[in-house]
Amino acid sequence: MNTSITARELFDQQRDKLALRWVAGPKGEHREIQAGSNNARRPSLAGYLNVIYPNKVQILGTEELAWLDSLDARQRWETIEKIIQVQPLALAISKNQSCPEDLRAAADESNTPLWISSKRGHELLNHLSYHLARTLAPRVTLHGVFMEIYSIGVLITGEAGSGKSELALELLSRGHRLVADDAPEFTQIAPDVLDGTCPELLQDLLEVRGLGVLNVRDMFGDTAVKKNKYLRLIVHLTRPMTEPTPSGYERLTGDSGSRHVLDLDVPLITLPVMPGRNLAVLTEAATRLHILRTKGIDPAAMFIARHSNLLERRTP
């Protein structure tokens, strides 16, 4: 999924938090940053003023403005030209410092957004870098019900009619929490982290066949919903055409594997859906088993090791 953010969107999203004022270049509000650039050297999203390797958002603190003031007239004009020519998303001046008139005029003439903030430079840098990195991170929408089970994020998947929503409803009644139904969005915010959230349209809602759309927050309370959660496990529901006959090894380890999501391989456990099976209990057990495995505890491996040791002791 391609993502981008414009200068206007960034300003509106951070205006209150960073006490931003737009002082020049209002016509540049449609400038944008695109995610997934294939440039040999991608510019930093935000950083202190750098003329050689310009950032997409150039921050001018006390030292940067003092450096501009130290230049003679020609050097200052050439430097401002270089700052403007690369078409940054915006220029941001920290600590409510006065904006140099020549910089303001250049920003207006080139339609370069120029902001002033009451925050210190490092606060601007931290907030803008984090917000831009998260907004422009790779993201994907998956079909399923995303829940928090025993404090970890579990995505329940399966074909239509496999019982995902009914399972989610049973898990909610057992004290677990809903993040998103039907179309959770996952963002890779770190090399090994997928953060799952719910689209605004579907917030707090769960669709169950025969009952229609339910408001989970109203039915189960505020604690039954969760704003976001890191994806750690996928539980896939499948309806076998015949009674499954797992091999001996599968009976020991279960039907485990992984699913590739963005750049990560997420652990996956497959549960056959058959009459009489308590899927809520099985899903809870699968989650507990995954937690144990992440701690290095594998009951199947322990059993195989015990069995091997027993055979070795009995071998003459």
Swiss-Prot record:
Pfam families: Hpr_kinase_C, Hpr_kinase_N. One of its GO terms (molecular function) is protein serine/threonine/tyrosine kinase activity. Its EC number is 2.7.11.-, 2.7.4.-. CDD domains: HprK_C. Residues 272-277 are annotated as: Important for the catalytic mechanism of dephosphorylation. It is an enzyme of class 2 (transferase). Disulfide bonds: none annotated. Keywords: ATP-binding, Kinase, Magnesium, Metal-binding, Multifunctional enzyme, Nucleotide-binding, Serine/threonine-protein kinase, Transferase. One of its GO terms (biological process) is regulation of carbohydrate metabolic process. The active site is at 143, 164, 182 (proton acceptor), 251. It catalyses: [HPr protein]-L-serine + ATP = [HPr protein]-O-phospho-L-serine + ADP + H(+); [HPr protein]-O-phospho-L-serine + phosphate + H(+) = [HPr protein]-L-serine + diphosphate. The keyword Protein transport does not apply. Mg(2+) binds at residues 165, 207. Residues 206-215 are annotated as: Important for the catalytic mechanism of both phosphorylation and dephosphorylation. InterPro entries: HPr(Ser)_kin/Pase, Hpr_kin/Pase_C, Hpr_kin/Pase_Hpr_N, P-loop_NTPase, Ser_kin/Pase_Hpr-like_N_sf. ATP binds at residues 158-165. Its cofactor is Mg(2+). Belongs to the HPrK/P family. The Walker A ATP-binding motif also binds Pi and PPi. Both phosphorylation and phosphorolysis are carried out by the same active site and suggest a common mechanism for both reactions. Homohexamer. Catalyzes the ATP- as well as the pyrophosphate-dependent phosphorylation of a specific serine residue in HPr, a phosphocarrier protein of the phosphoenolpyruvate-dependent sugar phosphotransferase system (PTS). HprK/P also catalyzes the pyrophosphate-producing, inorganic phosphate-dependent dephosphorylation (phosphorolysis) of seryl-phosphorylated HPr (P-Ser-HPr). This is HPr kinase/phosphorylase. It comes from Xanthomonas euvesicatoria pv. vesicatoria (strain 85-10).
